[in-house]
Amino acid sequence: MYSFNDTLGYHAPLDVNNLPDDKTAITIENLDLHYGQSQALYDISMRIPKGRVTAFIGPSGCGKSTLLRCINRMNDLVEGCKVTGSVKLYGSNVYDPSVDVATLRRRVGMVFQRPNPFPKSIYENVVYGLRLQGVKNSRTLDDAVERSLRSAALWDEVKDRLHENAFGLSGGQQQRLVIARAVAIEPEVLLLDEPTSALDPISTLTIEELINDLKTQYTVVIVTHNMQQAARVSDYTAFIHMGKLIEYSDADTIFTSPMKKQTEDYITGRYG
């Protein structure tokens, strides 16, 4: 039961239920979430390891995207949303009243289900966040564009058309551009909310290979409906059902020998 990381070589999976602080990127403790009178998450506690890919799986409407969006407080945008408990990023509670949400979202980048490039050039899409931060030096911006597009496995395909409109790219290329835009500001964590659900199989495979590369630089958390995808890309997997964390372990355990019957029933297609 070993996974492979190109940087670190073979390593035994961590016990995510007893993860030490120095290997933890995100700590979620006793997290409840309500939308008005409706409760969506129930007493969720878990630790997400840094430098790894963690997947949230579960049936539609189970709360996995809601949980993901707690990490960078995207749920704040939903009227009537109330969160209790804590979500800590490297030990600091992101729900502390002193937290600047814009700064948090620079530290925790996010990519959504459908590619959402801005109606700008490829170049301007990548540097958008840097310009918001006040970066003006052209050499700095140029370097960031190349670095980010290389990180997103897109540089060789677009290096000669950087000033063309991003809408001219294919769907798969647009999604990789969105990933490049997210990593350009060098976040510590990258959240992926079903990033391949709108893509064809070939583009999906490209994104999956990219995710494996990204974990050498970032902590990655992905929501996916596709269990085969979760098994392929994740080091650790959390099964969520009806707003509750049912089981959380290394991916090999979840997909081959889960401890909970609910998990086994979902993995084997008995429900969900």
From Swiss-Prot:
Tell me what gene encodes this.
pstB1
What name goes with this protein?
Phosphate import ATP-binding protein PstB 1
Give the Enzyme Commission number. 7.3.2.1
Q: Which GO terms describe its cellular component?
A: plasma membrane
Output one GO MF annotation. ATP hydrolysis activity
InterPro entries, per this entry? AAA+_ATPase, ABC_transporter-like_ATP-bd, ABC_transporter-like_CS, P-loop_NTPase, PstB-like
Function field:
Part of the ABC transporter complex PstSACB involved in phosphate import. Responsible for energy coupling to the transport system.
> Where does this protein hold ATP?
58-65
Q: Which family does it belong to?
A: Belongs to the ABC transporter superfamily. Phosphate importer (TC 3.A.1.7) family.
Which reactions is this enzyme annotated as catalysing? phosphate(out) + ATP + H2O = ADP + 2 phosphate(in) + H(+)
Q: Which UniProt keywords apply?
A: ATP-binding, Cell inner membrane, Cell membrane, Membrane, Nucleotide-binding, Phosphate transport, Translocase, Transport
Q: How does this chain assemble? A: The complex is composed of two ATP-binding proteins (PstB), two transmembrane proteins (PstC and PstA) and a solute-binding protein (PstS).
* GO terms, biological process: phosphate ion transmembrane transport
| Subcellular locations according to the entry | Cell inner membrane
UniProt membrane topology term: Peripheral membrane protein
